[in-house]
């Protein structure tokens, strides 16, 4: 008799901004422009980091990984979100939703871990420059980057399997732009406290641990910078560190707000909370990937020279 109250869902309806056509049009234009900037900025960085031999260093290897990751991260959700803004039928299959959840969580976890690895790389380069070639050899930095991807994939696979095994009732309306794992969990007609606890533990491990490494690394870097006698020599590294910390705090902070609040206790003002989650989505899914190329590399002298060299070579070939 218990199964009579349940139906096997084959698709979900993504509510997004349904009922607000003007907002949908505004968000479509805004997110589309940001997505194009993300593709151009990160694509350029990947291209020059491969083609320019001077950029074949651990730092640019990590930056290339970050750029590729940001393109993948946004592509898992942004195109489908843009289509849903213009379409009256805003549905996604159960299997498509599971794939979207897996890719989204995998990319998010990978980026958190990779940002921690990149902070450690900069700490060694600035605070221990003589030992840098030994510590950050190819045998070290390639496994570091690969490990970030593996951690993200494993964590996401575990989380996604736990969610798709939940029983879902007749309510198939996801109050979000995409299949965010928490938004999908809300639809389960079962106790999700166990899922929330596992998500809390993994988020703490893969978000706060890299964040702690980032804070410690940049604190030591800043202390090392202040030992430089020349104020001119301090200004550029200081501004670079502050800019990078801003991006990291924006990315990690929004994910912290998204995944570490007790969702099972959200009974009052749920509409306001869902609106907040949608706003957070814009920040950590679009803003951070758009800012990363500018903050981490496109202001860098070596990168600017590499871009100029690439353009000159292209014009010469013509």
UniProtKB/Swiss-Prot annotation:
Q: Which UniProt keywords apply?
A: Cell membrane, Disulfide bond, G-protein coupled receptor, Glycoprotein, Membrane, Olfaction, Receptor, Sensory transduction, Transducer, Transmembrane, Transmembrane helix
Q: Name one GO cellular component term.
A: nucleoplasm
Q: Where in the cell is it found?
A: Cell membrane
Q: Which organism is it from?
A: Homo sapiens
Q: Which cysteines are joined by disulfide bonds?
A: 97-189
Indicate which residues are glycosylated according to the record: 5
Q: What does this protein do?
A: Odorant receptor.
Gene3D superfamilies for this protein: Rhodopsin 7-helix transmembrane proteins (1.20.1070.10)
According to UniProt, the name of this protein is Olfactory receptor 13C5
């Amino acid at each position: 008799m218990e199964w009579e109250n349940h139906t096997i869902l084959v698709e979900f309806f993504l509510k997004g901004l349904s009922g607000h056509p003007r907002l949908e049009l505004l968000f479509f234009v805004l997110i589309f422009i940001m997505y194009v900037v993300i593709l151009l900025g990160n694509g350029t960085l990947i291209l020059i980091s491969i083609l320019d031999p001077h950029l074949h260093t651990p730092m640019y290897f990590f930056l290339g990984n970050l750029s590729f990751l940001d393109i993948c991260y946004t592509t898992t959700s942004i195109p489908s979100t843009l289509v849903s803004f213009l379409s009256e039928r805003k549905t996604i299959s159960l299997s498509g939703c599971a794939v979207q959840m897996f890719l989204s969580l995998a990319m998010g976890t990978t980026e958190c871990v990779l940002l921690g690895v990149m902070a450690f790389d900069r700490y060694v380069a600035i605070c221990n420059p003589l030992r840098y070639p030994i510590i950050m050899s190819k045998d070290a930095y390639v496994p570091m980057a690969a490990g970030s991807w593996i951690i993200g994939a494993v964590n996401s696979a575990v989380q996604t399997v736990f969610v798709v095994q939940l029983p879902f009732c007749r309510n198939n309306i996801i109050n979000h732009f995409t299949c965010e794992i928490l938004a999908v969990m809300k639809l389960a007609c079962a106790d999700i406290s166990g899922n929330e606890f596992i998500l809390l533990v993994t988020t703490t491990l893969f978000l706060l641990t890299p964040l702690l490494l980032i804070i410690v690394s940049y604190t030591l870097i800043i202390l090392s910078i202040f030992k430089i006698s020349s104020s001119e020599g301090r200004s550029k590294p200081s501004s670079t560190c502050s800019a990078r910390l801003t991006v990291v705090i924006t990315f990690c902070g929004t994910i912290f707000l998204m995944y570490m609040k007790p969702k099972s206790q959200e009974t009052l003002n749920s509409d306001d909370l869902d609106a907040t989650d949608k706003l957070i989505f814009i920040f950590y899914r679009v803003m951070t990937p758009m800012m990363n190329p500018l903050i981490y590399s496109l202001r860098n002298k070596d990168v600017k020279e590499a871009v100029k060299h690439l353009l000159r070579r292209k014009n010469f070939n013509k």
